Amino acid sequence: MTSILTNVAAMAALQTLRGIDSNMEETQARVSSGLRVGTASDNAAYWSIATTMRSDNMALSAVQDALGLGAAKVDTAYAGMENAVEVVKEIRAKLVAATEDGVDKAKIQEEIEQLKQQLTSIATAASFSGENWLQADLTAPVTKSVVGSFVRDSSGVVSVKTIDYVLDGNSVLFDTVGNNGILDKVYDVSESSVTLSINTGGVVSEHTVAAYTVDDLIAGGAVFQGNYALAGGVNYVKVEGVWVEAVASSGAPGQEVAAVTTAAAPITADSWAVDTTAGPAASVPAPASIENIDITNAAQAANLDALIRGVDEALEDLISATSALGSISMRIGMQEEFVSKLTDSIDSGIGRLVDADMNEESTRLKALQTQQQLAIQSLSIANTNSENILQLFRQ
């Protein structure tokens, strides 16, 4: 039926044109944004996943920056520690040279002093962004952390993982408060036994007694009171920095050190004692730290072998600490590479979920433009129906 009031053909053409225009708007939005899921209304599930993963990627980007900062700190400490190893090697070489008869120990000590100052300079300068891992207050171990990763578990709980490095007596060159660093702590290199001159009732005789380091006694439960101590039921006295087992009682005058039979008993004439006025018959190695090496000192000059062993122990600690820093540096480098690849993988995964296929969208846009032109022509034709009816009345 033909009607001048209702143009059904025009209405159908207009409805088709509106649908095409709507599809064109969506396609143009995808082409311009590059996304097929740009809002939650496009696909709520994919949009939610993509938004969460983009947030995680931002956190991983921050982790990458933190890893770079951490790597700089570790590399700075490693460079300082590596240099310190070489300096301590030089000190050991100087001590070995000092064992030669006829050498000028004072001149060698001058060189050692310069090397010791270089160690101090290294420890002070090895700082990055206010962080110095080569000198610290070792009242208690200090844990330094480098951000390593950002993790979201299966339940959606997020956490930041760190790479830790402990600053203690085995990893720090100098203790800023006490003497517990590698270079300022005392390395006990005492022999297992020492021969002493013992004055018993005015009769001097030699006795070989057990020698102990301070650490050994502490481990045995010793409680030190002045220059004598009791550990495990055995009495000890301190002779030139080394604790030895007391073996004889004496009422002779001039006794410099003594150990009592019990921790609570007072020192009396009947106490166990060692007379050190004459000195030991065999030399007692004097423990020393690298910081306090002075071969012009008679006690140290007489025990160069012990000093060399002490320096060698410190060198082993330095090498171990340097190795630990190198391992952490390697791990940080690996983590940086992993985080970079992980970020790329997440970006790729997000793209698969929400990115538009530009070839497909471009083809669809061309098709819709053609459909739009045809729909416009169809609407134009439908609108001419009323004119055709008027032509009938004109005839």
From Swiss-Prot:
It is found in: Secreted; Bacterial flagellum. GO terms for molecular function: structural molecule activity. It comes from the Bacteria. Keywords: Bacterial flagellum, Secreted. Pfam families: Flagellin_C, Flagellin_N. Its main location: secreted. The keyword Nucleotide-binding does not apply. Gene3D superfamilies: f41 fragment of flagellin, N-terminal domain. GO terms for cellular component: bacterial-type flagellum; extracellular region. Flagellin is the subunit protein which polymerizes to form the filaments of bacterial flagella. PANTHER family: FLAGELLIN. This is Flagellin D. It comes from Rhizobium meliloti (Ensifer meliloti).
